Swiss-Prot record:
The encoding gene: rpsT
GO cellular component: small ribosomal subunit
GO molecular function: small ribosomal subunit rRNA binding; structural constituent of ribosome
UniProt similarity note: Belongs to the bacterial ribosomal protein bS20 family.
Protein name as catalogued: Small ribosomal subunit protein bS20
Species the sequence originates in: Prochlorococcus marinus (strain NATL2A)
Pfam families: Ribosomal_S20p
Function: Binds directly to 16S ribosomal RNA.
Length: 98
């Protein structure tokens, strides 16, 4: 166990950062799931409202992924991979509807 005050503080900081990173990753996963659900809804019922909802969820997900990469929560390649998955899903849905 830590003996010095600085070591004890570092343990507290590491735990705080771990929880923040866990929360951030969870939010990214949730937003990605929402995007895929929005794709499914738009695929079944194409319309202006569902398309606007789809675009809004994609913008939120892309923004959150970029911020996670910027903060160092996600590796840049992981972020790029996730954004690519979302883009492929979006293009597939839009191509099928048109």
């Amino acid at each position: 166990m830590a003996n010095t005050n600085s070591a004890k503080k570092r343990i507290q900081i590491a735990e705080r950062n771990r929880l923040e990173n866990k929360n951030y990753k969870s939010t990214v996963r949730t937003l990605m799931k929402r995007c895929f659900v929005a794709c499914g809804i738009f695929e079944k019922e194409p319309g202006d409202e569902s398309k606007a909802d789809l675009q809004k969820t994609f913008n939120l997900a892309f923004s959150k992924i970029d911020k996670a990469v910027k903060k160092g929560v996600l590796h840049k390649n992981t972020g790029a991979n996730q954004k690519s998955r979302l883009s492929v899903a979006l293009k597939k849905v839009l191509k099928e509807v048109v």
